[in-house]
């Protein structure tokens, strides 16, 4: 053994070839500080052993290296730039050591080699991957750029255009695609990986492969004529800005870094990368996106833990077909859980099956599925008008019309037609789970399972715990949601649960602005372009359905009369009373027509302005800051109330719920990350400025206390 640590082992094989094996104690290899330090020491030991003539990097895990240890990032990035720059420079010395060894090197890549893992293999002269490999640089998804030489080595290896696409999109790539552009040198079967790597290394040792020329190319300026470079980088900037926009600076920074370093050799090129990496690491966007990644890991960890308490869900049923039922059936069946879709009307079943077929056909059109897979998924969906096929299922999802009496009747009926240990859930968006549980003999085997529309696109599922729901019930539904490919968060029962409860104060803030004469289109523009929502409040109401919003608003007003009760008509009432229900009947705040692609196209409609003007008077202009404050403060305070009341367990789960359930701008990280970034005291001061507008704008005592103590919701 040449070197051994808890994360790395180095031993000498035949023919004086050394094998460096990444093999950490956990389930995966990560490039944490300990591993980088071990790699540094291992390379020193390798360099000192004069017998070694070649080096192969391998992994003792099912994945090569999944990337850097992101759990270290937030604490690390909180330090000053003067501390971070030497840190990243020192880390890069380690990768340079790989590249500077006096003999040829190769990486044998299995499974994931992402981020720092991929940058590690870029430092070797050759790369060979097995058929399970996934390679890529996903740092831009975290608001960063590669920091261990990725922006320097990859363009010199695969060309500027290919490298720009790899780095700015942050996508991972299959080995065949990586081979095509030259990121790796061969693809082999997993059982042949190490032997093939050693064989290639021997070809380099016998000078059949010119490893020194390979190495020199990676360390030299980019081989790109000046005019071609100008065109490449200008085109890339235009295309990337169109996708990334002004709120996500990392992809544009990556282009600038590659462009600036194009004429430089390794040392100067790496310095350009270091400085840009550190600047991005200090941005609020990076903090927010890293926070989302960590929150996602926390939620997934909770779901995994729940799986240990859960009963097996091998079959399911959805009651109520149509678009929602069809979407739930598609999601369950496509992820491997057979599902019965029951309705009382054949046309509804046809609609549900049609929805599933449409979604599957779209997958085939995009090249993500095949007709054979489509047939298999459809065979996993059993459409029925009676309860016979439902009797042995493990979980039932009730998804009938949003009416308490109808739901209660259907729930009581299905309980008579399933096994004693079946779990029953309701896909209600507003009706109390405790109220619905009264219709059941076994309320302990009942909870809410709130999907968001469209089911196949929206990642969130709210699992709503009623006062009688058992831990096994909750755990089983969480596990089933995870199995469906969804992100489940557990919330306690209250009007609107979590997501709708915090959404409607936002709509109330919007309605208040309209009552004071604001233009709904101007509000939408500010909330989309400046704050970053995918849709402004008027457009969102049109898409959700103003009739749906009107009903939910009434539920919220009844549940929280002090804060959400209304004195008179608001904008939602006006639209509803005029039967302007949004996209569903082509008129809401906006008018809708169908474009050439068959998609709804929105236009301003004078009728909307006439209706609102008759109630609220002439339009007035509002500053962007006031529009943002008056819409967002109520949502933020209500979110904090949900945490304080125990409706949601942690800031992390709240923020994931908002990002995945409502489309809260990811670059802001969620409500709690947003407050922490602003500073709790600054937020309290801003809310106090608008406190005269009513209870929705009045912060809680606990918030004031946190502000006074200079506290935050997330701990660094």
Curated annotation (Swiss-Prot):
Which GO annotations describe the biological process of this protein? fatty acid beta-oxidation
Could you tell me which pathway this protein works in?
Answer: Lipid metabolism; fatty acid beta-oxidation
Residues annotated for NAD(+) binding in this entry: 324, 343, 400-402, 407, 429, 453
Annotated Gene Ontology cellular components are:
fatty acid beta-oxidation multienzyme complex
Q: Where is this region: 3-hydroxyacyl-CoA dehydrogenase?
A: 311-716
GO MF annotation, one: NAD+ binding
Residues carrying the site annotation Important for catalytic activity: 119, 139
* Enzyme Commission code: 4.2.1.17, 5.1.2.3, 5.3.3.8, 1.1.1.35
Please name the catalytic residues of this protein: 450
Could you tell me which residues belong to the region Enoyl-CoA hydratase/isomerase?
1-189
**Annotated positions binding substrate:** 296, 500
Task performed by this protein: Involved in the aerobic and anaerobic degradation of long-chain fatty acids via beta-oxidation cycle. Catalyzes the formation of 3-oxoacyl-CoA from enoyl-CoA via L-3-hydroxyacyl-CoA. It can also use D-3-hydroxyacyl-CoA and cis-3-enoyl-CoA as substrate.
- HAMAP family in UniProt: FadB (MF_01621)
PANTHER family given for it? TRIFUNCTIONAL ENZYME SUBUNIT ALPHA (PTHR43612), TRIFUNCTIONAL ENZYME SUBUNIT ALPHA, MITOCHONDRIAL (PTHR43612:SF3)
The entry assigns this protein to a family as follows:
In the N-terminal section; belongs to the enoyl-CoA hydratase/isomerase family.
> What is the protein name stated in its UniProt record?
Fatty acid oxidation complex subunit alpha
Q: Whose protein is this, by species?
A: Shewanella woodyi (strain ATCC 51908 / MS32)
User: Upper taxonomic classification of the species?
Assistant: Bacteria, Pseudomonadati, Pseudomonadota, Gammaproteobacteria, Alteromonadales
Gene designation = fadB
């Amino acid at each position: 053994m040449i070197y051994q640590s808890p994360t790395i082992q180095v031993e000498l094989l035949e023919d004086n070839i050394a094998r460096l094996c990444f093999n950490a104690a956990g389930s995966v290899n990560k490039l944490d500080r300990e591993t980088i330090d071990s790699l540094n020491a291992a390379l020193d030991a390798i360099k000192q052993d004069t017998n070694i003539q070649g080096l192969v990097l391998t992994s003792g895990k099912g994945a090569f290296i999944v990337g850097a240890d992101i759990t270290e990032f937030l604490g690390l990035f909180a330090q000053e730039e003067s501390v971070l720059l030497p840190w990243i420079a020192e880390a890069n010395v380690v990768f340079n050591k790989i590249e500077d060894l006096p003999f040829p090197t190769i990486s044998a890549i299995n499974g994931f080699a992402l981020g720092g893992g991929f940058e590690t293999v870029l430092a070797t002269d050759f790369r060979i991957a097995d058929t399970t490999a996934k390679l890529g640089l996903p740092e831009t998804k975290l608001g960063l750029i590669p920091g261990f030489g990725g922006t320097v080595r990859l363009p010199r290896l695969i060309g500027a255009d290919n490298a720009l696409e790899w780095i700015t999109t942050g996508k991972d790539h299959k080995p065949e695609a990586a081979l095509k552009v030259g990121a790796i040198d061969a693809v082999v079967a997993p059982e042949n990986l190490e032997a093939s790597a050693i064989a290639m290394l021997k070809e380099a040792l016998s000078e059949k492969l010119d490893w020194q020329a390979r190495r020199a190319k990676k360390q030299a300026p980019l081989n790109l004529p000046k005019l071609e470079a100008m065109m490449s980088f200008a085109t890339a900037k235009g295309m990337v800005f169109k996708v990334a926009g002004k709120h996500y600076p990392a992809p544009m920074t990556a282009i600038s870094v590659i462009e600036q370093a194009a004429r430089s050799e390794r040392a100067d090129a790496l310095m350009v990368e270091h400085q840009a990496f550190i600047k991005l690491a200090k941005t609020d966007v990076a903090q927010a996106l890293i926070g989302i990644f960590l929150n996602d890991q926390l939620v997934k960890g909770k779901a995994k833990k729940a799986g240990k308490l859960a009963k097996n869900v091998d079959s399911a049923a959805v009651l109520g077909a149509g678009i929602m039922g069809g979407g739930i059936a598609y999601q369950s069946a496509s992820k491997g859980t057979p599902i019965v879709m029951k309705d009382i009307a054949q046309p509804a079943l046809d609609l549900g099956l049609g929805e599933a077929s449409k979604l599957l056909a779209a997958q085939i059109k995009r090249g993500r599925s095949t007709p054979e897979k489509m047939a298999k998924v459809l065979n996993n969906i059993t459409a029925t008008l009676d309860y016979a096929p439902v009797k042995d299922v493990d979980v039932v999802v009730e998804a009938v019309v949003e009416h308490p009496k109808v739901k209660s009747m259907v729930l009581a009926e299905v309980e008579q037609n399933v096994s004693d240990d079946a779990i029953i859930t309701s896909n209600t968006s507003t009706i109390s789970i405790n109220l619905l549980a009264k219709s059941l003999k076994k309320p302990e085997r009942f909870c809410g399972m709130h999907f968001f529309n469209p089911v196949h696109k929206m990642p969130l599922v709210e699992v709503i715990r009623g006062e009688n729901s058992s831990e096994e019930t909750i755990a089983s539904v969480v596990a089933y949601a995870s199995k469906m490919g969804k992100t489940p968060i557990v919330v306690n029962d209250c009007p609107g649960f979590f997501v709708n409860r915090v959404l409607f104060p936002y709509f109330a803030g919007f309605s208040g602005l309209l009552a004071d004469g604001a233009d709904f289109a101007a509000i939408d523009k500010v909330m989309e372009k400046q704050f970053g929502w995918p849709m402004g409040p008027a457009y969102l109401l049109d898409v959700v359905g103003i009739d749906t919003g009107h009903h939910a608003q009434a539920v919220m007003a009844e549940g929280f009369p002090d804060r959400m009760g209304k004195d008179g008509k608001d904008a939602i009432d006006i639209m509803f009373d005029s039967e302007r229900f949004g996209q569903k009947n082509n008129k809401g705040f906006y008018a809708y027509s169908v474009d050439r692609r068959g998609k709804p196209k929105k236009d301003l409609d004078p009728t909307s302005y006439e209706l609102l003007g008759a109630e609220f008077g002439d339009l007035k202009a509002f500053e962007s800051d006031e529009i943002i404050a008056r819409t967002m403060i109520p949502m933020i305070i209500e979110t904090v109330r949900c945490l304080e009341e125990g409706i949601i367990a942690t800031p992390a789960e709240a923020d994931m719920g908002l990002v995945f359930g409502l489309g809260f701008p990811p670059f802001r990280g969620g409500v709690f990350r947003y407050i922490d970034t602003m500073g709790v005291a600054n937020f309290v001061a801003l809310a106090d400025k608008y406190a005269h507008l009513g209870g929705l704008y009045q912060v809680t005592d606990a918030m004031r206390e946190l502000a006074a103590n200079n506290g935050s919701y997330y701990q660094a």
